[in-house]
Amino acid sequence: MGGLIIEDLQEGFGKEAVKGKEITVHYTGWLENGTKFDSSLDRRQPLTITLGVGQVIKGWDEGFGGMKEGGKRKLTIPSEMGYGAHGAGGVIPPHATLIFEVELLKVYE
């Protein structure tokens, strides 16, 4: 079992996402078997969160850190930094590794 794996797909050149900042993101999430379980792109509705305060799974709080506006990353998130032994909403099974492609749209001052 490894930790969080961050792969930069596209370098961003805008403001940097740091703990405590509000950010707006697009994301798509898959299980390891390729099953897509959620996508803000499919809804055409980005998500705004405050980074590093526990609003989202730990893999996101850490995975967006240091990213710059316009950047895209692939995050491979181990279960303990995702939804753990409980899974989520009948869609994410217990102990699931999650794979997200994320795009940082905006960092707010």
From Swiss-Prot:
Sorted keywords for this record are: Isomerase, Rotamase
Q: Does the keyword Iron-sulfur apply?
A: no
Question: What's the domain of life for this entry?
Answer: Bacteria
Q: How is its activity regulated?
A: Inhibited by FK506.
Q: Say which species the protein is native to.
A: Neisseria meningitidis serogroup B (strain ATCC BAA-335 / MC58)
Please name the PROSITE patterns in this protein's record: FKBP_PPIASE
Coiled-coil ranges (or none): none
User: What gene, per UniProt, encodes this protein?
Assistant: fbp
Instruction: Give the protein family.
Output: Belongs to the FKBP-type PPIase family.
Q: Does the keyword Isomerase apply?
A: yes
EC assignment: the record states: 5.2.1.8
What GO biological process terms does the UniProt entry carry, in alphabetical order? protein folding
Q: What class of enzyme is it?
A: isomerase
Q: Which GO terms describe its molecular function?
A: peptidyl-prolyl cis-trans isomerase activity
Q: Give residue ranges for domain PPIase FKBP-type.
A: 20-108
> Reaction catalysed?
[protein]-peptidylproline (omega=180) = [protein]-peptidylproline (omega=0)
Q: Which InterPro entries does this entry report, sorted A to Z?
A: PPIase_dom_sf, PPIase_FKBP_dom
Protein name in the entry: FK506-binding protein
What are the disulphide bonds in this sequence? Answer: none
Role: PPIases accelerate the folding of proteins.
